[in-house]
């Protein structure tokens, strides 16, 4: 059975079709996730909180583990700007994730001869 990446990033099992190419859709999804490992990302949650941290892993339920995570609360009228709360290692339940934004890598990286 081949794994198919759905729109929200979760995978589901499907039966193989006759017209499959050499690279299965599950392989593409796996490579995409592997390319995001150890990258900084911002996760927006359903309750308005934002978590920023280093992407370490995910599971079949779309839960995400962030390292060196910081929590930012949604600003309110009484407290317009709040300091981030340092969480360290944080697990974000997949059903609470609204959006994920990945930090761009630096344009140039040092080259060694």
Curated annotation (Swiss-Prot):
InterPro entries: LSM_dom_sf, LSMD1_Sm, Sm, Sm_dom_euk/arc, snRNP_SmB/NAA38-like. Keywords: Cytoplasm. One of its GO terms (cellular component) is NatC complex. GO terms for molecular function: RNA binding. Residues 28-106 form the Sm domain. It is found in: Cytoplasm. CDD domains: LSMD1. SMART domains: Sm (SM00651). PROSITE patterns: SM. Residues 1-29 are annotated as: Disordered. GO terms for biological process: negative regulation of apoptotic process. Auxillary component of the N-terminal acetyltransferase C (NatC) complex which catalyzes acetylation of N-terminal methionine residues. Component of the N-terminal acetyltransferase C (NatC) complex, which is composed of naa35, naa38 and naa30. Belongs to the snRNP Sm proteins family. This is N-alpha-acetyltransferase 38-A, NatC auxiliary subunit. It comes from Xenopus laevis (African clawed frog). The lineage of its organism: Eukaryota, Metazoa, Chordata, Craniata, Vertebrata.
């Amino acid at each position: 059975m081949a794994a198919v990446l759905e729109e929200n990033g979760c995978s589901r099992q499907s039966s193989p079709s006759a017209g499959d190419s050499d690279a299965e859709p599950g392989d593409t999804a796996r490579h995409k996730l592997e390319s995001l490992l150890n990258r900084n990302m911002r996760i927006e949650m359903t309750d308005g909180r934002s978590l920023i941290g280093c992407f370490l892993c995910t599971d079949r339920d779309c839960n995400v583990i962030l390292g060196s995570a910081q929590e930012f609360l949604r600003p309110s009228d009484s407290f317009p700007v709040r300091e981030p709360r340092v969480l360290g290692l944080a697990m974000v339940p997949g059903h609470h994730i609204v959006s994920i934004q990945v930090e761009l890598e630096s344009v140039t990286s040092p080259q060694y001869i």
